[in-house]
């Protein structure tokens, strides 16, 4: 399940009128229908062949740009797009090693290299916004993409919950974004219990796939 390989299928974005059919617009880069935007050129969203030969700083920039280019494909609703934007900014600035230690204090395995984790995370989100042209011919990959989409939705829901907690009390940023105190099982505050349980599950998921969601 969830093989993290670059999906060979089209990258799409769900549109707003699921009952209408037929192509509405065709351009050199996309075919737009009432249900989907099918991108015929995936190049802007994929890492270039020179990625491995690039310096680390340039690799970070390449990853960052591609995560942000996926914003229109993640969701149509402005609120979800905003949460995705905040989520990506946080992921590129957080102290993931500290966050992981708070959530999994008994785990002594080294943290996967951030660039490799970023590459795998990009592939994961690419799968989440992808559809198989003929799902019946490859049901396993279609199901994998569906699972990625559901997980990404849950991740963005958690991000929205963090934003709401911070909005109500800006001082919570230290707990949620800096020292990650809420992830400590000994931190007893019911406001953070469901968020902590969900985030710990995601960190366990990252341990399995080598992602950094």
Swiss-Prot record:
The lineage of its organism: Eukaryota, Fungi, Dikarya, Ascomycota, Saccharomycotina. Belongs to the IRC19 family. Keywords: Sporulation. This is Increased recombination centers protein 19. The keyword Secreted does not apply. Involved in sporulation and maintenance of the mitochondrial DNA. Is probably involved in a pathway contributing to genomic integrity. One of its GO terms (biological process) is ascospore formation. InterPro entries: Irc19 (IPR016613). It comes from Eremothecium gossypii (strain ATCC 10895 / CBS 109.51 / FGSC 9923 / NRRL Y-1056). It comes from the Eukaryota.
